[in-house]
């Protein structure tokens, strides 16, 4: 395959098909051999996007294993804002459709406020179920941060409708 006769927009359409079909290795190799800077930029973008897809796919490893065991409704639970000095703890439980790709998905502490907002909106729109709980500082002071977080996780899980068949918890032991 030779891409030198293609316009940059045609190369872009081939590398990033609107219908999400898989791109052939022949096309990728042909693009790598294309001397045009515009095509080189597209190849770098393609490689970045593929690396991000692989990173996010690795996050779903436990969920996929649960699905392979026959569980259809798998919830993920996590907290943010931990710390008795920092104020309340927010806990959320979410059941996402299998195979949903959320680019930029990462630990909330590792992403910007803008990305968190974008992900929040997309999760609210596409999730099968979402439940969130805010554990206040008084509760944290009364029972300790670990117990307050665990209680918040249970409350968030029991707030899901439909109820999950399996729960994956990101917790400190």
What are these regions (language model features)?
Residues 1-75, 85-90, 94-173:
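Acidic (Asp/Glu) carboxylate-rich active-site/surface patches
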Residues 78:
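Substrate/ligand-engaging "lid" and interaction regions
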Residues 81-82:
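Short active-site segment of divalent metal-dependent hydrolases/proteases
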């Amino acid at each position: 395959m030779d891409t030198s006769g293609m316009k940059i927009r045609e190369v872009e359409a081939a590398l990033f098909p609107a219908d999400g079909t898989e791109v052939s290795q022949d096309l990728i190799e042909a693009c790598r051999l294309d001397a045009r800077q515009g095509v080189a930029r597209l190849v770098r973008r393609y490689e970045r996007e593929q690396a991000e897809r692989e990173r996010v796919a690795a996050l779903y490893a436990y969920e996929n294993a649960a699905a392979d065991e026959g569980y259809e409704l798998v919830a993920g639970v996590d907290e943010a804002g931990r710390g008795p000095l920092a104020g309340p703890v927010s806990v959320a439980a979410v059941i996402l459709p299998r195979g949903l790709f959320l680019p930029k998905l990462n630990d909330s502490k590792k992403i910007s406020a803008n990305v968190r907002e974008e992900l929040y909106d997309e999760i609210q729109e596409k999730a099968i179920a979402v439940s969130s709980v805010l554990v206040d500082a008084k509760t944290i002071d009364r029972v300790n941060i670990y117990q307050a977080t665990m209680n918040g996780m249970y409350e968030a899980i029991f707030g899901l409708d439909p109820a999950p068949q399996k729960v994956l918890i990101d917790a400190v032991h």
